[in-house]
Design a protein with these regions (language model features):
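Small/flexible residues
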Residues: 4-7, 36, 80, 126
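Substrate-binding cleft and catalytic face of glycoside hydrolase catalytic domains
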Residues: 69-71, 111-198
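N-terminal Sec-pathway targeting helices
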Residues: 2-20
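Hydrophobic alpha-helical membrane-insertion segments, chiefly the h-region
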Residues: 20-29
Length: 198
């Protein structure tokens, strides 16, 4: 009797697995027919015509934490300095963004090279919120002046500045409040954004 019950359970399990496999195969076939992979006919595409629309802006983009250097007051810096459950650094060899490429200090040279060496006409960069507002409600006028000078340098170079106000890093004070999860915290980002538009 017990053997019969085990055999019945095995048969039911096999039927369920076969049914799931069949359902998966049908779903894959249906999806591939409904949303086929695009196949380019390169023989019909004139690759010698590489023109872009008039006014197209060739540019470069950076993120403050990754290039500025010295960003130690945000959640990414905290994560870079943390360890996993086994005590290993979260980043290989314990490396961190650290001084990065020192864009904070070297931006005039970087902008000149973007224009002269690469022929770029625009530059998108991010404003590091943790530098501008290192503590809740306390704005750093030196950091704001720095970003104004950077924008002026981009314009003086004949390039168009494009600004990102949030590139995935939060000031530690904001992160410790729960970041963007609590709805009431959004007001802090709105206040920062308004200050940047002044």
């Amino acid at each position: 009797m017990r053997v019969q019950r085990v055999e019945n359970q095995m048969i039911v399990t096999v039927i369920i697995l076969v049914g799931l496999g069949f359902g998966w195969a049908v779903a894959c076939i249906w999806l591939s027919q409904r949303h086929p992979e695009p196949i380019w006919d390169w023989s019909a595409i004139d690759t010698s015509d590489r023109s872009f629309p008039k006014g197209f802006l060739w540019g470069s983009a950076t993120a403050a934490h990754q290039v500025d250097g010295g960003n130690t007051n945000n959640n990414w810096a905290r994560w870079e300095q943390s360890f996993d459950e086994s005590g290993r650094p979260r980043v290989h060899n314990g490396d961190a963004a650290g001084s990065a490429c020192e864009h904070w200090e070297r931006y005039p040279e970087d902008i000149r090279r973007m224009r002269d060496d690469l022929g770029l006409r625009s530059y998108r960069f991010s404003i590091e919120w943790s530098r501008v507002e290192p503590a809740q409600g306390q704005f750093d006028s030196d950091a704001i002046d720095h970003y104004h000078a950077m924008i002026d340098a981009i314009i003086d170079a004949g390039m168009e500045p494009m600004i990102t106000l949030h590139h995935f890093t939060n000031p530690l004070w904001f992160e410790d409040m729960g970041g963007f999860e609590p709805e009431e915290n959004i007001a802090h980002f709105v206040a920062f954004s308004r200050r940047m538009f002044e």
